[in-house]
Each structure stands twice: as structure tokens, then as C-alpha cells.
Amino acid sequence: MPKIGCALFFAFLLSPTWAGCSLVPNAAAIPTREEIGRSCDGRPIEAVTMGNGVEVVLVLASIHGSEPAGTPLVERLFEHLTAHPELLDGRTLISVPIVNPDGYAKRQRLNSNGVDLNRNFPAKNRQERRRHGVSGLSEPESRALAELLARHPPARIVSIHQPVACVDWDGPARAIAAAMADACPLPLRRLGSMPGSLGSYAGIDLGIPIVTFELRPGDEAMDATELWGDYGPAILAFLAFAK
């Protein structure tokens, strides 16, 4: 091959597009991780951001450490969005894959102070009980999440739990929950607002649509690919939901 032809050929291969495919990753679709706080035992609480659109959506998992299946499901979401960055058009995804890192490490519901983080939010229906914490946001994990909500007010939230096997909601989120239930094996079911829960605080008090996505018992035995096969379409329905 003549030198000029060879040079043009390799310039083509190294160009941003080749055979119709982008060879340069979309920077907005690369997950960026930020420490937003530390747990009682000093473990980092990380938020992952993807996209740079105006609409903010929040995806949470493992606020109860004994309900761990949501974490690999969320990590699989990041992989899917990296491969399909168009799903982030107009949106910013913020996710906390492990809200309760101490509980997650120990596979226990509570944090290391013996507090149920999903009863530690300053909701109007909060109840004073030892396992709910000495006051609303007394725990570093719930404070980190509340501060994240204040810094980046989301258009909607999904919090992934186990093992009730249903799609629940608080606040103006019934239509979102129904769209998610239509896309997965879980039924739509209203469980009611729990005292001091994130659903009560964000959904009822702040008016942010929030879905509690309750996976099945035993789903933690599934790998990320299996979880994504069952629940990925519902997570994508949440992400793409439009009023």
C-alpha cells in the first residue's frame, strides 16, 4: 500500500467513528463515583452519577443490609447505560448502590448503631422508638442521603428492597409503579407509608414520587445477569417514565 494510502487507512481506524460505531466513549455515560458520607464504622457511602441532563432520577439499594439483591442489579444498570447512553438523554442518574454499607457487610437490616435507617427520616409520621434512632437523621447514613436529596432534588426515586415481592409507592408515584409492575414479574401493591421511612419523608412530606421496588425472597442468590433479566425492564421503565 502506498505510504499516503496507508496513512489515510490508519487515520480512518483511529477516527471517532468506524464502521458506524463510536470508538470514543460518551463521557456522560461513564459512571463517576463520589463519597457522600461515611457509615458508623467509617465505611464510605458512594453516589454514582451518569448523564448530565436537567431531569434527576435517584436509584437506591441496600438501605437494609439484609436485602442485598438490589446492589448487583444497580451495578448492572450502570453497565447497560454505558452501552446505551441514549437512555440518559435529558437525564442525570444518581444512584447510591449501598446506602447502609455496615449492614450490607454484616448482612443485617440495621446499621452499626442498631438503627433501622428506613425509620430514621424526619417524616411527619416518625415514631420515637429505640430502633428508629434518637432523632430524625441521627444516623450518618440517613443524613448523607437527605443531604444528597437537598443538593440534587430528584424528579422521582426508586428504592430497591426485599423480600415482599411487589411494587409499592408513596406520594404521586402510582403511575410510575404501575409502569414498573407491567415490565416485571412483581405485582403492583400498596403497602402503606411506614413511620419515618424515606417513602414517607420524600413521597408524602416532600411530594417526590418514590417507588419501593420489593424484590423476592432469595433473589440475592441470583447473579447480576439473572437479576437484570427479571427486573432490568422495570428499572428502565422507571428511568424513561414521562408524565
Show where each model-derived region lies:
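His/Asp/Glu-rich mid-to-C-terminal helical/loop segments that flank catalytic regions of hydrolases
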Residues: 219-243
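Active-site/substrate-binding loop(s) of hydrolase catalytic cores
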Residues: 39-40, 54-63, 67-191, 200, ...
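Short beta-strand/turn micro-motifs at beta-sheet edges
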Residues: 42, 46-47, 199-201
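Bacterial N-terminal signal peptides that target proteins for export
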Residues: 1-8
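Short beta-strand-to-loop junctions in surface cap/lid or active-site-entrance loops
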Residues: 46-54
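Short glycine- and acidic-rich boundary segments immediately preceding or forming the N-terminal edge
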Residues: 8-45
